[in-house]
């Protein structure tokens, strides 16, 4: 069974984008490629910080995160080469659509004073990156087991080559952009 948002994409979003932008070929219509969820961890925190972040990321995504390591020494940040500095998960396929559905429908509205995300955070190539203040906005995380609040960066990678196409795709998929 396909994800709910994938069927919405094929049944509603594709015809709307094709009509609006006059695409000649179905393969020109933008679509999601992947969603990357990244948690940066302060290397000088107590011992269990990386394990806690990896456990939280596993609960959110259902995938085991990859540990990101530093490439070189940076004395100002008290950072050594090959020291763990974060963890990330790349979601594709049905898992990507399920995570996007939970993000848009339940997690983002739980942010305090949420009025939508800025439509200016596109990178010029049709990808959208935004930060989430802490992991407790997701209902999968149990508040009693949280030792520290940990934010994360979420990147939505699309096949759209332009920001305008990616904005239209995300808007039609229910993404909560702030009004200008």
Task: Give, region by region, the residue ranges found by the protein language model.
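Ribosome-associated RNA-binding proteins
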Residues: 1-180
């Amino acid at each position: 069974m396909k994800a709910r948002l994938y069927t919405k994409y094929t049944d509603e979003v594709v015809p709307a984008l094709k009509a609006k932008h006059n695409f000649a070929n179905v393969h020109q219509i933008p679509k999601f490629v992947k969603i990357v969820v990244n948690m940066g961890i302060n290397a000088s925190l107590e011992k269990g910080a990386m394990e806690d972040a990896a456990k939280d990321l596993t609960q959110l995504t259902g995938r085991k995160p990859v540990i990101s390591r530093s490439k070189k020494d940076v004395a100002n940040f008290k950072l050594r080469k090959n020291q763990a500095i974060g963890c990330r998960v790349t979601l594709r396929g049905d898992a990507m659509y399920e995570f996007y559905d939970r993000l848009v429908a339940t997690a983002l509205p739980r942010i305090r004073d949420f009025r939508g995300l800025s439509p200016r955070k596109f990178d010029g190539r049709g990808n959208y990156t935004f930060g989430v203040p802490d992991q407790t906005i997701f209902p999968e995380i149990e508040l009693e087991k949280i030792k520290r609040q940990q934010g994360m960066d979420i990147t939505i990678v699309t096949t759209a080559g332009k920001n305008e196409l990616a904005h239209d795709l995300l808007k039609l998929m229910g993404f909560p952009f702030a009004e200008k």
